[in-house]
C-alpha cells in the first residue's frame, strides 16, 4: 500500500499536473484544448499528463459527440492539495512572523 501511495505522490509532485488538476476542479468538466489554455500548458504536454493521471485513476473522461471532456475522478485529490496548501500558508505565515 505504501508503494502505491508513493506512486500517487510522485504523480502529484509535478507542478504541471497540479495546475491541470486545479483547473479541472474549478471547471468541473472541460475539453483538453480549453484545459491546456487555462493552465498555460501546451496541448501535447497537457494530453501526456492527462494520460498519466487517467491511468492512475485521478482523472476521468467522457465523450460528448466529438468532444472529450475531462474531470477529476477522485474527489480526495483536490482535498489533499488544499490540505498541503493550507499547511504551506501556515508555515509561511509563521516564518514571516519570525522575520
Segments (PLM) and residue ranges:
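Juxtamembrane helix-loop transition sites at the ends of transmembrane segments
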Residues: 34-35, 43, 49, 92-95
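Short, hydrophobic-biased segments on the C-terminal half of alpha helices
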Residues: 21, 50-51
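N-terminal helix-turn-helix DNA-binding core of bacterial DNA-binding proteins
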Residues: 3-44, 64-76
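Amphipathic alpha-helical dimerization/coiled-coil segments
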Residues: 1-4, 26, 74-99
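Alpha-helical residues within the helix-turn-helix
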Residues: 37, 48, 54-55
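A short linear hydrophobic-aromatic micro-motif
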Residues: 20, 57-59
Amino acid at each position: 500500500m505504501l508503494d502505491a501511495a508513493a506512486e500517487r505522490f510522485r504523480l502529484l509532485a509535478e507542478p504541471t499536473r497540479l495546475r491541470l488538476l486545479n483547473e479541472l476542479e474549478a471547471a468541473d468538466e472541460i475539453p483538453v484544448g480549453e484545459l491546456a489554455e487555462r493552465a498555460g500548458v501546451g496541448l501535447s504536454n497537457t494530453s501526456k499528463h492527462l494520460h498519466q493521471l487517467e491511468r492512475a485513476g485521478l482523472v476521468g473522461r467522457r465523450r460528448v459527440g466529438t468532444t472529450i471532456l475531462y474531470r477529476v475522478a477522485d474527489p480526495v485529490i483536490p482535498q489533499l492539495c488544499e490540505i498541503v496548501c493550507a499547511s504551506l500558508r501556515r508555515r509561511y505565515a509563521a516564518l514571516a512572523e519570525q522575520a
